[in-house]
Amino acid sequence: MINAQDIKIGTAIRMDGKLYFCIDFLHVKPGKGNTFMRTKLKDVVNGYVLERRFNIGEKLEDVRVERRPHQYLYMEGADYIFMNQETFDQIPIAHDLINGVDFLLEGMVVDVVSDASTETVLFADVPVKVQMKITYTEPGLKGDTATNTLKPATVESGATVRVPLFINEGETIEIDTRDGSYVGRVKA
């Protein structure tokens, strides 16, 4: 059990039989009344974000989670097979438990988060920024730079990303996997 004032970003708590991760918090001390914590909690199972207010003295059930690096090996049926970098054990993870699955490549190292008490995989996080080569995009027209125009491009994982007109096929770009947005061109 932890006190509400001990909640930080990344803290895992169990509430109403569901597991939540804190993604944002604010310690509020109003001029009148008791101090409280305003939090944003993300449901691990379905990804819903819930705003919740806790009184400072309130006790919450904390969950100990482990974050370990795993390497993506291959796909088998509907599952993705990952290998633990420390023990070399292989585990299957379902498609819907992987954040940023569209940008997953063989050999990529991801963080697998699991419940420490039950060893159940909660989710896997692809790195926030990845570098990928563009496999197909339409050529940009010379002089078509009056506005910040974007065009679709397919990267080596098969995902489609919106990139600026000056990006050509064969170039390597950096992508933010949280929203699939173009970050920049990678210098060779």
UniProtKB/Swiss-Prot annotation:
Q: In which pathway does it act?
A: Protein biosynthesis; polypeptide chain elongation
Recorded hits in Pfam families, A to Z, give: EFP, EFP_N, Elong-fact-P_C
> This protein's superkingdom?
Bacteria
Q: What does the UniProt entry say about where the protein is found? A: Cytoplasm
* Family per similarity comment: Belongs to the elongation factor P family.
The protein's UniProt keywords, in alphabetical order, are:
Cytoplasm, Elongation factor, Protein biosynthesis
**Stored InterPro entries:** Elong-fact-P_C, NA-bd_OB-fold, Rib_uL2_dom2, Transl_elong_fac_P/YeiP, Transl_elong_KOW-like, Transl_elong_P/YeiP_cen, Transl_elong_P/YeiP_CS, Transl_elongation_fac_P
What's an example GO BP annotation here? peptide biosynthetic process
What does this gene product do? Involved in peptide bond synthesis. Stimulates efficient translation and peptide-bond synthesis on native or reconstituted 70S ribosomes in vitro. Probably functions indirectly by altering the affinity of the ribosome for aminoacyl-tRNA, thus increasing their reactivity as acceptors for peptidyl transferase.
What GO terms fall under cellular component here? cytoplasm
Give the originating organism.
Answer: Phocaeicola vulgatus (strain ATCC 8482 / DSM 1447 / JCM 5826 / CCUG 4940 / NBRC 14291 / NCTC 11154) (Bacteroides vulgatus)
| Entry-linked CDD domains | S1_EF-P_repeat_1, S1_EF-P_repeat_2
Q: Does the record bear Kinase in its keywords?
A: no
Name used for this protein in its record: Elongation factor P
Gene Ontology molecular functions = translation elongation factor activity
